[in-house]
Each structure stands twice: as structure tokens, then as C-alpha cells.
Amino acid sequence: MAAPWWRAAFFGIGRCRGFSTSAFLSRRTPPLGPMPNEDIDVSNLERLEKYRSFERYRRRAEQEARAPHWWRTYREHFVKETDPKDKIDIGLPPPRVSRTQKLLERKHFLRELRANVEEERAARLRTASIPLEAVRAEWERTCGPYHKQRLAEYYGLYRDLFHGATFVPWVPLHVAYAVGEEDLIPVYHGNEVTPTEASRAPEVTYEADKDSLWTLLFINLDGHLLEPDAEYVHWLLTNIPSNRVAEGQETCPYLPPFPARGSGFHRFAFLLFKQDKPINFSEDTRPSPCYQLAQRTFRTFDFYKRHQEAMTPAGLAFFQCRWDDSVTHTFHQLLDMREPVFEFVRPPPYHPKQKRFPHEQPLRYLDRYRDSHEPTYGIY
């Protein structure tokens, strides 16, 4: 038998809120600024100015979207973004280039390109070839450092290495691992390199002045087995004269990457620091060979804090690495220790409290609360 109408009305009013109540509560707090379209007179829509084209409407919509508003967007409510102006820039100052000079160079290049008959004919016949090396060099010289900075922020390198401080890698750092006699595995900015490919020290090149000094650091951000806030130093070269890496002081010998099995991808970073003068790195010196992980415990932030008066971060390159068979050899032969193996243990599935009378539930409902693994389905 259906419930009387007066009972439904009585209990319905007690459990829900009407439109009038919601409207009244919303009026209790006035808006913090003008509401959208508040300045439009809706009483006479025929007199309003029309856009007459979609392009005008699009420009107006983009202008309104870029304008500051008093209300918060969905991203501002749920994503807490730090202001880039609040971050400390610890890198080198940007090179000063006149904008007028840039425009003149672009005009001169376009003029030469338009006057080149062979290039025009090759483009028309679809046989033109693009010099990728020149394109990459131009990218490294213009917007490349900013792209590298954005990638490093995306992977959390600045957050974990320098506690939020940032820098623009103005000096292009080229790192490549030799595989075989002719093949090279380059290190870009987030690509994957296996531990087998990185078993030997890489070839590092960069452009530098004749009388300058540099420091090269190679670390693992995610591989420490005991301290979550520490890193392992795999290679440290100090007081490098100009770009002659082989003549630098090997403060810490090279150790191949050893990401533990089951720990996923690890971030390995090459940091290039520019020195203002020769620095004494006796506190950071490790014995050679160094196969004790306790001696390779490292903190980049403390290292930079000790020598920040005499060196500045200038270059960056990093890759991702995960376990392969060569890691077992590194643990057993070089580090002389048992290999740690990690496994993700999933939490047990949650089941609500069992009902005595599971109304409209399938027969498999009882399998959730049985002690044995024998299924109920198919027995009866």
C-alpha cells in the first residue's frame, strides 16, 4: 500500500532543501566582484552590437579569457601552482642579445632564402632536405634552454635536487654512451638508457672558454636504499679545464647505474657547474675504487650550498633507467652484496559487512565471506 501524500510531503520537506531556500542562502554572501554579462542590458537585445563574424567573436572570447577575474577557476581550486616569480634562479644570467639585431638576422636569412632558386625548385619538387644539425643548433641557441628547464621541472629535478630553486641550462651539455665500436646512445632530457648501455663512463662535450673551469656531477635521484632524501653519486669530475673532460680531477670514480629490481624507473642526471676559481673538493673526495654505498651517499643541495660562492649550475642532461640483467652483476661483483628485490604488495580487497539477508544479491555474494577459496557458483 502506498504511503499517504501527507506523510511523503512531511518527510520530504525534512530531508531536502527547496529552491527558495537555496536562493535565499546564496544571497546572504554577495559576490566579490561584477558577475559575467552584468553590464549587458537584456531588456532590449535588438540594440546590442552584433559580432557579424566568428573571427570577431573568437578574438573577443580570447581577450575575455585572458583578462583577470575575481573568481577562481577549476584549476585554481584543485591544483596549487607556485608562482614562477617566487622561485630563486641560481643559474647563469641570460645572454644579452639585441632584439634589433635578431630582427635584422631573420630578415637577412629570409631574403637569402627567397633569392635561392635551387631551394625554391627543391621545395616545389618535394626534394628539399632539412639540415637537422643546423636546426638543433639554432634550437640550442634560442628556445632550447627554456624547454629543458620545463622538462626538468616536469620530472621534479629542481624540486628534489635544489629544494625548489631553478636555473636555465644555458650551456648545451652533450652526453653519449659508447655501445660497441661505432654506436652511441645519447642522453637527452628524459629518454631511457639501460644499465647495460651505461656500464662505462660516457663521452661528455660542451662549449667553453679556454681559461674556464667546470665541475661535472652524475647522480641517481631515486636509488638510495636507506635514506629517501639522499642520492647516490656515480661520477664526480672537478676543476675541469675548459671542455677537456679527461683532464679533470676524478673526485669520485664512475659507477654503473644499479636501479633495484622492481623499483621502477630511476632518474639519473648530469649536472654541469661553472667555477669562478679553482676549488678544494677534499670533503667530497671518494677513494678509488669506491664500492661502498655508504661512501657514495650524496646530497646535491648540501654540495651546492658548500660551494655556491665559487660555482654556478650551467648545464643539464638526464635520462631514465630501470633494472636489467647487468644490475645483478653490479651488485654481486662490484658492490659485493646481495641484490635487493622489491615487489608491490596490493592491499586486500575491501568488503562491507556481511548482510544476514542479502536481498537481490547474486549467489557469488557469499564467496566474499567464505574462509575457503572454493567458489559457491556452480555447486548448487
Curated annotation (Swiss-Prot):
Pfam families named among the record's database cross-references: PBP
The entry's keywords: Coiled coil, Mitochondrion, Ribonucleoprotein, Ribosomal protein, Transit peptide
Transit peptide among keywords: yes
InterPro entries membership: PEBP, PEBP-like_sf, PEBP_euk
Targeting signal (transit peptide) range: 1-26
Protein family membership: Belongs to the phosphatidylethanolamine-binding protein family. Mitochondrion-specific ribosomal protein mL38 subfamily.
Protein name (Swiss-Prot/TrEMBL): Large ribosomal subunit protein mL38
Species name: Mus musculus (Mouse)
Gene that encodes the chain: Mrpl38
